[in-house]
């Protein structure tokens, strides 16, 4: 007679969860940050609000963003004028867009990840789909399963309305699924489109205007599995540990609310200060088992909520400028893509590591950290272990 313990042991993988492939995608429409204020105030018929436009121009100038990608084109916005007002009922129009476009953009990223992985898509056992853009039933996970032609028996998990920390959440869940299901291959997808948050300017809600200056559209997909097949699968990073915490005294620091007017975004407290004040505690808890206290000995992937967060974290921890170079580069080239950001940064780190001739996928270093920050204030901390870089 087989015991429960024997069954449980047989169900579990032997090695750590490993990222086996990464794919990314953006909509084709690219907007230049330097000219975006002119476009934004023109399309929202707000050009007469010159003082507010000057404030927005300063926000964009200080954002350190060069360009962003957006599904919303001028033509789409002209066809949906309610989306250009600050608080006009417009949820139906927004929903009709995102329930179609979110899975499509996710498919583009997932297809690239599957191609890099090099295995048959029928070998994908689990699907995790994450988006803050819209809600539907059956969800984007179901739609992506159909679009990709995955097996009907693929085990799906749909994450809606998590926000900017959720790239870390996706990695944490993919790690648990891979390590607790022997032979599992998890496709995890983050897909974000700002059609739910775009709106006209308001003199009384400058925090909403901050979001209009920062957010962009994008998707990223990863394949995660334990015990990579030798000579068939190529590991990129090992997921060593993952944790989530709510920062103290941070209630209401970042809020998002889905209403008839779409998803409204609110910054109510000193978010950069709260994160920088508490980040070392998260680092100490994560790296104490490894006896690591030198934060400059790590490679870094941090959600780029905005330049102020990165500046204060860098100063608080005494990080060398190159530590957040990949993070700042993704912010500059794409803006804040919510949950997808950290996965694009991860892709940037491994590609630059190979291009620059580093010995490991983590910029030549062995250990790394990935941080997600978002509503709550919630922080996700993932400890990464690099592998030997291969061209």
From Swiss-Prot:
The active site is at 164. InterPro entries: Chalcone/stilbene_synt_C, Chalcone/stilbene_synt_N, Chalcone/stilbene_synthase_AS, Polyketide_synthase_type-III, Thiolase-like. It holds the Pfam family Chal_sti_synt_N. Transmembrane segments: none annotated. GO terms for molecular function: acyltransferase activity, transferring groups other than amino-acyl groups; protein homodimerization activity. One of its GO terms (biological process) is polyketide biosynthetic process. Belongs to the thiolase-like superfamily. Chalcone/stilbene synthases family. Homodimer. This is Inactive polyketide synthase 2.
